[in-house]
């Protein structure tokens, strides 16, 4: 594993330790230090880190990402938060999330399987709101990956290209 080789930095100020999820999102267990949030953002804005790991609401064929607006349920998002600061100067970005919202996955000896398809695809023709620009990422030379349970995609001059496909995950239709 990579334990001891990774130091997590969270926008709320925690450095090191293990990031917490759910209601405790933004906190960390056994953090090495706590920075004032403005200092943490100065660090992020300066690109002082190797890789950013973030999630997404929607991704489109050009690599644009929406994390800040979900028209049908605007109460589910609180805006972009520190997302723009974290992605603007990152040399490498890994977006990770489910290919379909609310899909049920099962991990077995045979691999990862989609037990129940999601309610809707998070891979869309055009995102509702551009919080991260795929075009800007290409222009600035950022290395961007999109990781889902079904495939890994990389941003290219032609848009998203699947570079790895999970053979055990049942595909409905990959229209990216």
Q: PLM features: what roles do these ranges have?
A:
Residues 5-7, 50-51:
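Beta-sheet entry/capping signal
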Residues 1:
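Active-site pocket-lining segments that scaffold enzyme catalytic pockets across diverse folds
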Residues 6-14, 96-97:
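Short internal beta-strands
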């Amino acid at each position: 594993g990579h334990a001891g080789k990774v130091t997590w930095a969270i926008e709320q100020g925690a450095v090191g330790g293990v990031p917490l999820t759910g209601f405790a999102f933004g906190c960390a267990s056994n953090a090495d230090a706590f920075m004032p949030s403005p200092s943490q953002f100065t660090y992020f804005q300066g690109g002082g880190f190797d890789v950013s790991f973030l999630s997404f609401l929607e991704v489109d064929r050009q690599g644009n990402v929406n994390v800040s607006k979900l028209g049908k349920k605007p109460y589910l998002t609180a805006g972009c938060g520190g997302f723009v600061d974290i992605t603007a100067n990152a040399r490498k970005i890994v977006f990770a999330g489910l290919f379909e919202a609310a899909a049920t996955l099962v991990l077995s000896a045979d691999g990862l399987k989609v037990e129940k398809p999601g309610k809707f695809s998070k891979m869309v023709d055009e995102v509702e709101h551009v919080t991260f620009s795929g075009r800007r990422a290409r222009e600035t030379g950022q290395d961007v990956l999109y990781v889902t349970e079904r495939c890994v995609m990389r941003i290219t001059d032609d848009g998203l290209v699947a570079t790895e496909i999970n053979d055990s995950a049942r595909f409905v239709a990959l229209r990216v």
